[in-house]
């Protein structure tokens, strides 16, 4: 809660400021819960301060976790400010320890990369002022209907790959034969629909 203990999870219903720690959420992948819990416990033990939206003081801002359904690759991105005096210790040492904790987790998926993004924007958005790769790579792969996509942490891509496959397959059935036809991919985000039809 606002001005309360360190929390990591979702916004409290009806509140822009309050965050509620979500443990064992039934609608997300269990790997997400393990990663969230590990990061939260690590920074609670360090005494790190979260970024206060009104005073603009603090270190921890967001935790971005993405996982591919088909490849099971996971990308983790810790988003902080550059206010390292609030991280509870030596930032470089802490980040190395956090990477070690995350890499030692027993997960169903495989961690493709662990990133650290700095964001000093006053807005409550996950903005990329600078990103360091702490481990692995700064992307992961997902597959849709036989095509392989390289996904970066801030790219728009369907979060429900299985649902996207059903949607795209349905769209493909409506369009019919596309051989020797030109397809204009207008207003469709990353262009996955046109790639499926090509």
Spans of features found by a protein language model:
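Accessory RNA-recognition modules of RNA-modification enzymes
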Residues: 1-198
